[in-house]
Amino acid sequence: MTLLYEGKAKRIFSTNQENELRVEYKDEVTAGNGAKKDTMAGKGRLNNQITSIIFKYLQENGIESHFIKQLSETEQLVKPVKIIPLEVVVRNIASGSITKRLGFENGEVFRESLVEFFYKNDALNDPLITDDHIKLLNIATDKDIETLKTKALEINQVLKKLMDAMNLKLVDFKIEFGKTETGQILLADEISPDTCRIWDKATNANFDKDVYRNNTGSLIETYQIFLNKLEDLK
C-alpha cells in the first residue's frame, strides 16, 4: 500500500487491486485556501461517514460516483479517476463569495440554480473561470463542460430533497469530477459540510464549515448533529 497523494483533508493510497484506491480522511480543517488551519479530533471520521452516506444516497438516485464502499470510520474504497482540475459550484441561495463579487444580498434566493467553475490552482487562489477559459486551458471540451453542468444540476436536485427531509436548506455546494480510463465522467472527492453551505430552515443556523470560518460555533458538534440527522433518515 503506497501513499499516492496527500491533500488538505485526505490521503489517497494504492491497494492490491488495480481498479481500487483507499481514501483516508484526515482530522485537519482549513479555511481560506489554508490561511486558517487546525487539527480537530473526529473531523475525519465525521466527513468520511457523511460522505459515504450521501454518495450511497446519490447512487440510489441514479448519480454515479467513484465511491465503492466505506471501509472504516475514517476510510473508504473508491474507483481511480483522473480529477478534472475544476471546482464545480452550484448555488441556490446567495451567500459567501458571490455576495461580495456581484452584490447579491446574503440569503437572496436565485430564480434558477447557478453553476460556476473555479480553476483548481492553489498558486492562483482557485479563480472563477468561464467556459472559454476552460477550453483555452485545455481542461475540458465543450461536451465535457455541458456534462459537468448537467450532472451538477442533477446532483443539486437530489441533494435538495435530502436536505429538505432534514428540515435544512441547501444554499450552495462545490463538487469535483474525474474521468475513468474509458473517459466516463464520475462524481469524485467528497460531499460533506466541508464542501456545502447548509442552513436550518427555521433559523438559518449553519450546519457547515462557516461555523469554523466565522468562529460562530463548534465544528465537531455541528458536523455530529448533521450526521445524526442523516442517520435518522435511514
Swiss-Prot record:
Xref: Pfam families: SAICAR_synt
CDD domains (alphabetical): SAICAR_synt_PurC
The entry's keywords: ATP-binding, Ligase, Nucleotide-binding, Purine biosynthesis
Pathway listed: Purine metabolism; IMP biosynthesis via de novo pathway; 5-amino-1-(5-phospho-D-ribosyl)imidazole-4-carboxamide from 5-amino-1-(5-phospho-D-ribosyl)imidazole-4-carboxylate: step 1/2
Keyword ATP-binding: yes
Annotated family: Belongs to the SAICAR synthetase family.
NCBIfam families, per the entry: purC
Alphabetical list of HAMAP family matching this protein: SAICAR_synth
The protein's name in its UniProt record: Phosphoribosylaminoimidazole-succinocarboxamide synthase
Organism of this sequence: Staphylococcus aureus (strain bovine RF122 / ET3-1)
